[in-house]
Amino acid sequence: MDNNPKINECIPYNCLSNPEVEVLGGERIETGYTPIDISLSLTQFLLSEFVPGAGFVLGLIDLIWGFVGPSQWDAFLVQIEQLISQRIEEFARNQAISRLEGLSNLYQIYAEAFREWEADPTNPALREEMRIQFNDMNSALTTAIPLFTVQNYQVPLLSVYVQAVNLHLSVLRDVSVFGQRWGLDVATINSRYNDLTRLIGTYTDYAVRWYNTGLERVWGPDSRDWVRYNQFRRELTLTVLDIVSLFPNYDSRTYPIRTVSQLTREIYTNPVLENFDGSFRGSAQRIEQSIRSPHLMDILNSITIYTDAHGGYYYWSGHQIMASPVGFSGPEFTFPLYGTMGNAAPQQRIVAQLGQGVYRTLSSTFYRNPFIIGINNQRLSVLDGTEFAYGSSSNLPSAVYRKSGTVDSLDEIPPQDNNVPPRQGFSHRLSHVSMFRSGFSNSSVSIIRAPMFSWIHRSAEFNNIIPSSQITQIPLTKSTNLGSGTSVVKGPGFTGGDILRRTSPGQISTLRVNITAPLSQRYRVRIRYASTTNLQFHTSIDGRPINQGNFSATMSSGGNLQSGSFRTVGFTTPFNFSNGSSVFTLSAHVFNSGNEVYIDRIEFVPAEVTFEAEYDLERAQEAVNALFTSPNQIGLKTDVTDYHIDQVSNLVECLSDEFCLDEKRELSEKVKHAKRLSDERNLLQDPNFRGINRQPDRGWRGSTDITIQGGDDVFKENYVTLPGTFDECYPTYLYQKIDESKLKAYTRYELRGYIEDSQDLEIYLIRYNAKHETVNVPGTGSLWPLSFESSIGKCGEPNRCAPHLEWNPDLDCSCRDGEKCAHHSHHFSLDIDVGCIDLNEDLGVWVIFKIKTQDGHARLGNLEFLEEKPLVGEALARVKRAEKKWRDKREKLQLETNIVYKEAKESVDALFVNSQYDQLQADTNIAMIHTADKRVHRIQEAYLPELSVIPGVNAGIFEELEGRIFTAYSLYDARNVIKNGDFNNGLSCWNVKGHVDVEEQNNHRSVLVVPEWEAEVSQEVRVCPGRGYILRVTAYKEGYGEGCVTIHEIENNTDELKFSNCVEEEVYPNNTVTCNEYTANQEEYGGAYTSCNRGYDETYGSNYSVPADYASVYEEKAYTDGRRENPCESNRGYGDYTPLPAGYVTKQLEYFPETDKVWIEIGETEGTFIVDSVELFLMEE
C-alpha cells in the first residue's frame, strides 16, 4: 500500500514533515502532534509500560511533560472549544496554560531526581532530594488541579484536567511503591496510598460526569449536529475516557506487577459521504440508530460488498459481514444485510483478517445534485470505492473495492506511534461496518448509501491470552457466549467498553482463554463487579468447579453507576489450567430476581503475586501478634494502649470475608483476648463510660454538661465530650478515685488515653502531690484524611474500613516526671508514684479532667490507669521523701484544724437555743450568722483546691458546721415576714410610687435607693394580732432631711424608724447583707435555707450525707506552712458577704399589731435614702 502512488498524496499521515492545517470554526490546529496524537501515545504507553520506576517517569517526560509546550496545551483547549462552540476566557486560558507549564518544569526536576536516585538508591542525599521533590510535586498538583475545574469551563478544560490528574496519580503511585526506600515513615506512605485510591475514584467520576455533560450539549437533530456529536464522542473517548479507564491500574497494591488491560469500546468515523455534514435535516436520530447497540466483541472476518448503479454511476449499495467470536471459537456467523443487494456488478469479498486486521480505509465519495428532479434524476450521495489497508510489520497489499480515494480514516483516528509507518503504529482496527441509507431509486428525491465504519482499539486482542508473568484483565464483553438472561449494556464511560448485566441468578457468560504459560502455573481469579445485592460468584474451567464465594452489594438499587459502585474482589484458592485452550465460566447465584448485577471484567493473577487482601491479612497478623509479649498471648506489652487494641480490632474486622474468613475469625479471637487483658489491668472503674454519676461512691463523677457519645470513626467505644465553661469557678469536670486497695506499695502508675481534640484540658493525678498537665491537641475531626468523603457506612455507621491514618507509637504523648506534654499528639500519658499502702487512711489516687475556660473543650476516650513498674533507686527515695513531708504537713494541719474547729463550733452553737439546732436565739441576727459562717470557712482543706467538689481531709467537720449555718440562715429567713426584705429580687413584692431604684453595691449587695422625697415604697404584711414583733432596718442617709421606715395599721398604731445624716448613730457591728435567693412565702421554705452555695452545690451534685473520702492536696513543690489557696473558695459561703460601708445604721423597734395586716412604708423628706434591709419578726414568747 505504501508503494501505491495514489495513496502517497500529501495527507497528514503521509506528510508529517509538512502537516496540513485544518480550519474548523475559524480556529487553526496543526495536524500531526495534535491532542489526539498525544493522548493516543499516552494510552499506548499506559497499556504497555504501566510499571513504576524511572522508565515510567521518563516516559511521561518524553510523551508529554517534557515535550508539550504552550502551543500544544492551547491546542488541547481549542479542540474542545470548537466542538462545543464555547471559548474559554483569556484569564482562565492563560492561567491553565501557565499552570501546566509550571507542572511540566517541576516534573522534569522530579524526573531527573528520580533517575539519579534510582541509579544510587542508598545515597542519603539523593533519598532526601526525592522526599523534597515528591512533596513539592504533590503540593503543586494538589494546588493546580482545581484550576482546571473552573466554573462554566469544566468541559473545555476536561482533556488537560485528565492529563494533570494522570500525572498526580502517577506521582502518588511512586511514593506508595518507593516511599519507604526514600526514607518516609510507614504512616505517611499509607496516607499517600489512601490518597491515591480515593483520588482514582474522585478524578474518574469528575471526568465522566463532564464528558457526558458536553456530549449532551452538542446533540442536535440534523446530520451536521450528528457529525459534531460523533466527533466529540470519538475525540474525547481518545483524549479523556481511554486514559481514565486505566486509572485503577495505578493502585500499586492491587496491581503490584505488570498489568495488561484492553479497551473494547468502539468509536466511529463519520459516514463516508460528500457534503454529509450539512445536507440532511432531521436525520441525526436515524444515523445514530445505524450504529450497533451494545454487544459482545467479535472478530471481523470479511465484508461482502454489493454494487448498484444509477444513471450510469456505480456505488456501494449494501454489504454483509462475516465474523467470529473472540478466540475464533465456533463457526462464523453472518450479520443481516446492510443496505440493498445491488447486482450492477459482481459482489466483492474483502477479507479483513489478514495481518493484524484492517487499520485504514481510503474512500472515494460521489455526489450528484442534478438540475432536474425526477425519476432517474435524483440527488445521489454515495461511496463509489474504498481501499482497505492491513496492519502489518511487512508491506501487505491492500484490498480495494472498485477504487481507492482520499477520505482517509487516519485523519479521524491517527496512529498511536508516529515513529514507525502507520501500518505498524496504528491505534485502531476496523471492527464492523454498518450503513445509513435513505431513499429508493424509483421514488425518492435523494439516494443515500453511507457505510458507517466502527473501530476498536488494537489492545483488544483477537484471543484471550493468559501469560504467567503479568496480571491479565479480560473484559467480559470478550466472552464467547452469554448465559440466558445476561445482556450487554452500555458501559458507564470509565470501564473502557460495555459491560454485562444480570437481574436473576444464573450463568453470566463463558469465554475461551489461551494459556501461554506452563500448565503448572497457578492463578487466582478476581472479578470487577457492581451489584445492588449480596450474591455468590461461581467459577469453573472446562466444566470443573474452581471457586465459589460470597460477595456484598456495592450500590443502592436505582443508583447511577459510578467508580465507587464497582469493586474488585478475588478468591483465595489458586488453581491451574488443564489445557492450553480452556473455557472459563462465571455465574452469579444466591440473590433475588429483580436486583442488578454488573460485570466489567475478570482478572487472572499469578498465585505468587501478593495483592491488597493478602497485604491486609499480613498487616493484620503482624499487628495482632505485636500486641502480646509472647507467641502464646499470655500477656500484653506494656506500651500497647487500649486505643491501639481497638484500632487493631478495626484492622481485623475490615479483612475480606471472601479472601480470609478463617484467618479473620482466628485473629478476631486473639484481639478479643487482648481487649480482655487490657480491661483486667485497667484500675479505672467503667473505662468505657457506661454512665456518669450513676453511683455516688464509685465510677465516674462529672458535671452535668458532659456528654457520653457512641463510637465513631475515631473511637471504637464510648467517649466523653467536655465543653467549655463561662466561669472558671464552675468548671467542666470529670473525676474518679482509684481505691487504695487496688494499689501496690512503692509502685509507679500511669494514666493514659486518647484525645481526639482538646483546648485547655487540665489533667490531674493527686495523692501526696498533684501531677498536672494542660493539654491542647488540635483535632482534624477524624482519623480519615480531610478530603475523604465516605467515612460513613451505608446504614449511617462509621466506616472504619475507609482509608485512615495509622497509629504511630512514636507520636505518643508522654508526660513523665514533669516533662512537658507533646501537645500535637493525640495520645497522652501521666504517671504518679505511690508509697506505702494504708487501707484505713484510703488515700488512693484521684484522676481529674477539668476545663475552666470558655473556649476549652475536649473529646477523649480509651482511658487507662495501670501499673507501670516498681520504684527503685532515686524514684523510691523521692516518693519516701514526699510521703514523709506529707505526713508532717498533715500532723501540723490537724493541730491547726482542732483550734479553728473549736472556735467555729462555738460560734455556730451560739446561734441556737439548744443542741437540736431547730431554733435561733432571740438576739441572733444576720451579722452573727455571717460571723459564724466566716469562722467555719477558716477550716482548711475541706475540698481539693484542684476541684472544689471533691472532699478533702476536713470535709466532714466542715460540712457538719456548714449544714448548721444553712439551718441558721433558713430559720432566720423563715421568721422574717417581710417578703424580699433584702431587695435581692429587685422591687418584687413591693409597691412603688414615684422613681426608685435597686442598685448592686459593694459586690453582691442589693440596696434600695430612694432619691426623691415624693417617692414611696410599701408592702402589706400579714401578722398575728396581739403578738409582739421587732422591726429592724439597716439603712444609710445621704444629704439633708430624714429617711423614714414606718409601720402602721389601717387606723392609728403607727411607729417609725428615722435615719438622718447629722445624728451620730451606732453602727451595727460587722453587719452584712445576705445573698439569699428570695422564696415567695414562709411555707415554701419548709425549714430549708438557700444560700449562695445553692447554685454551686446543685451544679456539682454535692451530697453532704455521704461520708467524705480523704485525699491529700499538697504539691511536692509546695511543702510550706502556708495554705494553698483556692481562688474560687470565696464562692462557697462567707466570701459573698462583704461588710457594710461606713455610714450604714441598724435600728429596731418593738411593735404590737392589733389586726392581721400591717403596712411597711419607706420614704424620705430630702436627699437620698439607701436601705440595705428591712426585717420584721416575732418576738420569742
Swiss-Prot record:
Name of protein: Pesticidal crystal protein Cry1Ae
Keyword terms: Sporulation, Toxin, Virulence
Pfam families: Cry1Ac_D5 (PF17997), Cry1Ac_dom-VII (PF21463), Endotoxin_C (PF03944), Endotoxin_M (PF00555), Endotoxin_N (PF03945)
Keyword rRNA-binding: no
Family: Belongs to the delta endotoxin family.
Note from the entry: Toxic segment of the protein is located in the N-terminus.
Alphabetized InterPro entries for the sequence: Cry1Ac-like_dom-VII, Cry_V, Galactose-bd-like_sf, Pest_crys, Pest_crys_dom-III, Pest_crys_dom_I, Pest_crys_N_sf, Pest_cryst_cen_dom_sf
Gene label: cry1Ae
Molecular function as annotated in GO: signaling receptor binding; toxin activity
Record-annotated disulphide pairs: none
